[in-house]
């Protein structure tokens, strides 16, 4: 299983070797396609995505914030569902709170507000 435990992000640009590597591990666990990953990252150019993946670089503050929220969602789900398969499956289940849509679908709408909405929901479910 990919290691996603070492992500530390802040509002300034950060080297992708830290945040982006953690995001890629998360994307693998959640079985996200390249197009889905690009959506979650805030739709950077495909060339930028592949540059980050190959050579590293710096992510914008918006991208750092997105990755931070996604990692928090992942960690909250691990607390709520100690069995990893159940935590990952939760993303695909439909939830009344999201208008009978899955959290994955809400996340893939691509707006930062939607990522925050999913994060706030899972944080509330775990009592955080």
Task: List each model region and its residues.
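Non-transmembrane "mature" sequence context
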Residues: 1-128
């Amino acid at each position: 299983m990919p290691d996603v435990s070492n992500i530390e992000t802040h509002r300034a640009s950060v080297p992708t070797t830290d945040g982006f590597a953690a995001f890629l591990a998360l994307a693998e666990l959640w079985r996200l396609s390249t197009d889905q990953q690009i959506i979650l990252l805030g739709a950077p150019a495909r060339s930028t995505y592949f540059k980050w993946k190959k050579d590293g670089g710096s992510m914008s503050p918006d991208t750092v914030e997105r990755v931070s929220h996604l990692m928090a969602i992942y960690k909250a789900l691990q607390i709520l569902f100690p069995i990893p398969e159940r935590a990952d499956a939760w993303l695909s289940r439909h939830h009344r709170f999201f208008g009978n849509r899955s959290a994955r679908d809400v996340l893939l709408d691509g707006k930062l507000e939607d990522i925050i909405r999913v994060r706030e929901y899972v944080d509330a479910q775990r009592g955080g």
